[in-house]
Structure formats: C-alpha cells, structure tokens
UniProtKB/Swiss-Prot annotation:
<feature type="active site">
    <location>
        <position position="180"/>
    </location>
</feature>
<dbReference type="GO" id="GO:0005737">
    <property type="term" value="C:cytoplasm"/>
</dbReference>
<keyword id="KW-0028">Amino-acid biosynthesis</keyword>
<dbReference type="InterPro" id="IPR029062">
    <property type="entry name" value="Class_I_gatase-like"/>
</dbReference>
<dbReference type="GO" id="GO:0016829">
    <property type="term" value="F:lyase activity"/>
</dbReference>
<dbReference type="GO" id="GO:0000107">
    <property type="term" value="F:imidazoleglycerol-phosphate synthase activity"/>
</dbReference>
<dbReference type="InterPro" id="IPR017926">
    <property type="entry name" value="GATASE"/>
</dbReference>
<feature type="active site" description="Nucleophile">
    <location>
        <position position="77"/>
    </location>
</feature>
<keyword id="KW-0378">Hydrolase</keyword>
<keyword id="KW-0456">Lyase</keyword>
<protein>
    <recommendedName>
        <fullName>Imidazole glycerol phosphate synthase subunit HisH</fullName>
        <ecNumber>4.3.2.10</ecNumber>
        <ecNumber>3.5.1.2</ecNumber>
    </recommendedName>
</protein>
<dbReference type="Pfam" id="PF00117">
    <property type="entry name" value="GATase"/>
</dbReference>
<comment type="subunit">
    <text>Heterodimer of HisH and HisF.</text>
</comment>
<dbReference type="GO" id="GO:0004359">
    <property type="term" value="F:glutaminase activity"/>
</dbReference>
<comment type="function">
    <text>IGPS catalyzes the conversion of PRFAR and glutamine to IGP, AICAR and glutamate. The HisH subunit catalyzes the hydrolysis of glutamine to glutamate and ammonia as part of the synthesis of IGP and AICAR. The resulting ammonia molecule is channeled to the active site of HisF.</text>
</comment>
<keyword id="KW-0315">Glutamine amidotransferase</keyword>
<feature type="domain" description="Glutamine amidotransferase type-1">
    <location>
        <begin position="2"/>
        <end position="196"/>
    </location>
</feature>
C-alpha cells in the first residue's frame, strides 16, 4: 500500500509518519503530484494558520489535485479545516471548499482558547473510521478554530460549544484532534483509516 503524507511544511508531519511507520506502513512525505496521484491513501496534516497552509498548497499547485482525489484522504487538525469552504481567520481565508461548511474561531466565556489537551468525542453515526472507538475514548486537541456540526459530522466534541471532531464526505475524512498524539485511540483511528 502506498501512503502519502502531503508536505505542507507543517510541524507535525514527522510525528504522523512515525505513527504510520510503527503500524508497519511504508510512508512518504511529498508534494510530488505524480506520487500523490499514484498513492492508495493520502494524509493531509496541518498545524498553524489556514492562510499559510493554503499559500503552500497554491505554491505547490496542489489545490485542484487534492479536490479531485478519489482515494481515501484524511485531514488532520488544520488539514480537516482546509476541507471547508472558508476560514474566518484573518477576516476571511478561502480554503479547499470540498464541503460547503465554514471554519470559525472558537468562543467560550469561561474556557481558555485555544482548546489544548485531552477531550472525548460523542459519536453521532456509526462508521468504519470509528470501529473500536466509543464515546469514552479521549483524543488530544490543539486548535482555536473549528467546524460547527454539519451534514458531514459523524462525531462531535464539547468545549464551550459543540464542534465537529470527525467528519466524512465521500472519500474525504477529517479529524480535528491529533491521532498521532492520542495514544491507543489515535492509533486505532489510523488503523481504521488504512483499512477503508
């Protein structure tokens, strides 16, 4: 199986690769369009700002390629947010518009933003991506922006407000948390993705 991590020049690429290697996967970090097209699975991790990530994808001529991918593609944290229509970060940043849902800054009158640390998910719809995972499983989050619950949401998390923590749309899968930092639960989710 050919597994590609799209090189967005973000800081968590190597930690995602380490987890995949631990699971016995042959994984390449690349921005080569030919390698991406020929892959069996794609991961789009991201840390930082939507504006910076979109500039990188545009510079590498990857925007249309990602949108046209037919193989299973997993967006992690910012990578999931990039699947949305736009982010209100820096007033307005256009993203990949794979799903017609905006990404908005989180708000809580009592909790600190960004949302940092462990939190559980509440599953709304059964899906192969969540096999072996239930509402008691905790994942590691680190984000200030989120997607509200929408037609692609299969699990959500509460942090001052409910937000989408797992989404599925066609061949695109997204998780707001970091599976590579989420111990057993994260490893189980990645295994499930690899089996889809």
């Amino acid at each position: 199986m050919k597994i590609i991590i799209i090189n967005t020049n973000c800081s968590n690429l190597s930690s995602v690769k380490i987890m995949l290697n631990k699971l016995g996967c042959n994984t390449i970090i690349t921005d080569d369009p030919d390698l991406i097209i020929q892959s069996d699975k794609i991961l789009l991790p991201g840390v930082g700002t939507a504006n910076t990530a979109m500039k990188q994808l545009k510079k590498k001529n990857l925007i249309q390629l990602i949108k046209k991918c037919t193989q299973p593609t997993l967006g992690i944290c910012l990578g999931m947010q990039l699947f949305g229509s736009f982010s209100n970060e820096n007033t307005h940043t256009n993203t990949l518009n794979i799903i017609n849902v905006p990404v908005k800054h989180m708000y809580s009158p009592t909790l600190p933003i960004p949302h940092m640390g462990w939190n559980n998910i509440t599953i709304l719809k059964k899906h192969d991506l969540l096999n072996g995972i239930n509402n008691n499983h905790y994942f590691y989050f680190a984000h200030s922006y989120c997607m509200e619950l929408n037609y692609t949401t299969i699990a959500y998390t509460n942090y001052g407000q409910p937000f989408s923590s797992v989404i599925v749309y066609k061949n695109f899968f997204g998780v707001q948390f970091h599976p590579e930092k989420s111990s057993f639960s994260g490893e189980q989710l990645i295994k499930n993705f690899l089996e889809i």
